[in-house]
Amino acid sequence: MKALSRMSSRSRQFLNFGVTFVSVMLCILILPTRLPGMELLGIGPNWLLIWLVAWSIKRKRTVWGAASMGLVLGFLQDAMTAPHPTHAVSLVVVGVLTVVLQKTWSIPADIVERDPIPIALIVFGMAVVAETVIGLQFFAMGDRALLEIWSYHQRVALCSAILSSLWAPVIYFPLNRLWEMTRNLEKP
């Protein structure tokens, strides 16, 4: 830790970027993985959504920052899956809503750091929002009936929200620890 504290400001910024980049890449790599306990009715957790919520809450980002990160993550997810409907719109909405939620409710940092329940609840709600946005995109494309979209959406939204909220602490707490370490290094 002493060696890290002697790093230059540019090196610390690079370390912070490296932690962010590597954590996003790990979430992308585990996105298609289906291990025991990671699947419910054929649906897995939305790792990028979990990462975006953790990043938006912990880093206290601006609305524009969260929207741009949601856009990037959405395009990365679209590159791995079908681009229509896009995941970018849903992740932009999630990023913006998470920042607005953080700013309007001002959830105390000590509660978020020691208790996984607020993070799990936020991830649950945001997963439902994200799947609803994707369902609305399916409806706007017009190639499916509303009843078909609605019945499928209920199953997908609930399974995704349950799994994502249960797995949220696995992403949030290690990232929180790494971001705290890099933030402490930035303090003089």
Model-identified regions with their sequence ranges:
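Terminal, non-globular segments
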Residues: 1-188
